[in-house]
């Protein structure tokens, strides 16, 4: 390491390099991961959290401190968040829910002008990820197969219905036959009718990918969803299978994409057919499995955005690592409602 690099590193270590995780909720593992990595630079570095109701958010009590924020849809959300960032000397903002991504992407330059980096992809890409019609076009453009769209006047069964802007399995329907269809299905213009992907033949995978500042992929970790609870993985296992090279060849670069992107795919166990479902440009609830497997995205973010280092593509994470989740407790003493 040269003298200039050493001087820069010492300056970084001596300065507070605090991180803010928004809508922290139950993301205890994510908070702990960032704490471990940022405190390896200096024990004085902090990971703070914000939430609409932090006193009832376990991750807020695990963090180094928390603040209350109004709803992300409130017109004053951004100005309030900026004040909090200045008070806590925040360097990186890590958003965790879809609605935050849009707002932070729209106001990214405002935070950057204050020396605060929201780790969020460009607005155009965030908007595309929020609309399944657009992301389907994105998949097709990159030669990734998608479920077949069905004509509402010429349906075949079984079929699957979901909204183009939905999340957490809200308003999704598996339709076995015509008698199960209602006026609601046809009158709701947001609902998409599509091919049903048979779970008896396909495994569902969440893929934790990391994209560097230039939009180049740096890591790809497929994790099979064994059991889902409340829309989030409860049991899962990492696999180094065909999906890795499939995505590496097709999505080696995504313009405007940065940080952790959580992608959903179906994988046919016999034919090896891979079907793209969606992309969420943020940390997913099941990311801790990839972290424990060695895909250290919190460290990647710190290296890129704080230490200003270039990242190489890495694939030295642990395959066949099984994660089994269970409920744990965070106790708050002297609580008054």
Residue ranges with predicted function:
Residues 2-119:
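ATP-binding N-terminal substructure of ATP-dependent carboxylate-amine bond-forming enzymes
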Residues 54, 165, 281:
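Short, glycine/acidic-enriched loop or turn micro-motifs at the edges of active sites
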Residues 175-257, 266-270, 274-275:
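Phosphate-binding site of ATP-dependent enzymes
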């Amino acid at each position: 390491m040269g003298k200039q690099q050493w001087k820069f590193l010492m300056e970084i270590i001596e300065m507070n390099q605090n991180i803010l995780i928004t809508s922290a909720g139950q993301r205890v593992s994510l908070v702990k991961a960032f704490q471990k990595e940022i405190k390896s630079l200096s024990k004085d570095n902090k990971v703070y959290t914000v939430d609409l109701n932090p006193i009832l958010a376990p991750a807020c009590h695990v963090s180094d401190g928390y603040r209350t924020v109004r709803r992300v849809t409130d017109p004053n959300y951004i100005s309030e968040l900026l004040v909090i960032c200045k008070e806590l000397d925040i360097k990186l903002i890590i958003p965790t829910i879809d609605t935050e991504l849009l707002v932070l992407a729209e106001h990214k330059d405002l935070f950057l002008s204050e020396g605060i980096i929201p780790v969020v992809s460009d607005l155009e890409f965030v908007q595309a990820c929020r609309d399944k019609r657009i992301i389907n076009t994105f998949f097709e453009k990159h030669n990734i197969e998608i479920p077949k769209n069905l004509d509402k006047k010429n349906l075949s069964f079984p079929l699957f219905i979901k909204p183009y802007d939905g999340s957490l399995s809200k308003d999704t329907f598996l339709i076995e036959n015509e008698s199960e269809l209602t006026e609601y299905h046809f009158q709701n213009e947001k609902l998409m009718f599509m091919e049903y992907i048979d779970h008896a033949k396909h495994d569902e995978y969440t893929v934790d990918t990391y994209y560097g500042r230039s939009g180049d992929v740096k890591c790809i970790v497929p994790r099979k969803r064994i059991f889902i609870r409340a829309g989030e993985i409860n049991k899962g296992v990492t696999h180094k299978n065909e999906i890795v090279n499939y995505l590496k060849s097709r999505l080696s670069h995504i313009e405007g994409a940065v940080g952790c992107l959580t992608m959903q795919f179906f994988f046919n166990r016999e034919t090896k057919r891979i079907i793209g479902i969606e992309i969420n440009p943020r940390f997913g609830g099941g990311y801790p499995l990839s972290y424990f497997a060695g895909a250290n995205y919190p460290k990647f973010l710190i290296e890129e955005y704080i230490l200003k280092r270039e990242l190489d593509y890495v694939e030295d994470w642990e395959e066949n690592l099984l994660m089994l989740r269970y409920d744990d407790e965070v106790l708050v003493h002297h609580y008054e409602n």
